[in-house]
Regions:
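Extracellular (secreted or membrane-anchored) zinc-dependent metallopeptidases
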Residues: 1-5, 10-200
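Extracellular/luminal regions of secreted and cell-surface proteins that mediate adhesion/ECM remodeling
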Residues: 195-227
Length: 227
């Protein structure tokens, strides 16, 4: 994997900051504000991990926004091997937020009985927490809206990590459409980050001058380099 300069990278950049925590104002996305600048959004999915204030687990930017703020932000307690804060300790915060990055809405449409713009998700009366027992809230938004109960196990709800386990076919299609012709995330498929770094193995193959013994305090060598 290559960084924006073409150098080999793990994709992880660590930054020391004097900011005790960050919020949803995107300061974490700018070096000048205590965070770290985004890599080019056409080539990389930027994920910032930091201390988020207010009990927030994470947030994301939908496709089509400003490139220098594009990506996902996750509280350090809820991601990686450091994330050990149940019931959000299985990585589903990243799954949920990357879902937003890939154009998925909350399954309840951010409104009572709202729409998430996906036809095969049942209508939800609201967000759900914990881990309800299935079937749950059958037809809570009216006859036929959720005959098998609301899909609280969907990654785009707010239930516990060990309760989430599904994207629907419609959600999958909505995400994949971003990588089709004209899609907002299409450029990621030809990302410069996937180009192997150029091996920096140049060396001196011959010394043209000086030759023999040379006792001057300074020299201007002429050499042949080969990569």
């Amino acid at each position: 994997m290559s960084d924006p300069s073409g150098n080999s990278t793990t994709g992880i950049v660590r930054r020391s900051t004097t900011d005790a925590s960050f919020s949803t104002d995107d300061q974490v996305k700018f070096t000048s504000q205590g965070g770290d600048n985004a890599w080019p959004c056409g080539d990389y999915l930027n994920i910032w991990v930091c201390d988020l204030s207010g009990g927030l687990l994470g947030y994301a930017q939908f496709p089509g926004g400003a490139c220098n703020t594009d990506g996902v932000v996750i509280d350090y307690l809820y991601t990686g091997t450091t994330g050990s804060t149940p019931p959000f300790d299985l990585g589903r915060t990243a799954t949920h937020e990357v879902g937003h990055y890939l154009n998925l809405r909350h399954i309840w449409g951010d409104a009572n009985c709202g729409s998430d713009l996906v036809s095969d998700t049942p209508t939800h009366d609201n967000s759900h927490g914990g881990c309800p027992t299935h079937p749950y809230h059958t037809n809570a938004c009216g006859g036929g809206t959720s005959p098998n109960g609301e899909m609280f196990m969907n990654y785009m709800d707010y239930t516990d990590d060990n309760c989430m386990n599904i994207f629907t076919s419609g959600q999958r299609t909505r995400m994949r459409n971003l990588f089709g012709a004209g899609g907002a995330r299409l450029s990621l498929l030809s990302s410069q980050g996937c180009v192997s770094p150029v091996a920096l193995d140049a060396g001196i193959s011959a010394i043209i001058s000086p030759t023999g013994t040379f006792c001057a305090t300074t020299i201007t060598p002429v050499v042949t380099l080969r990569n």
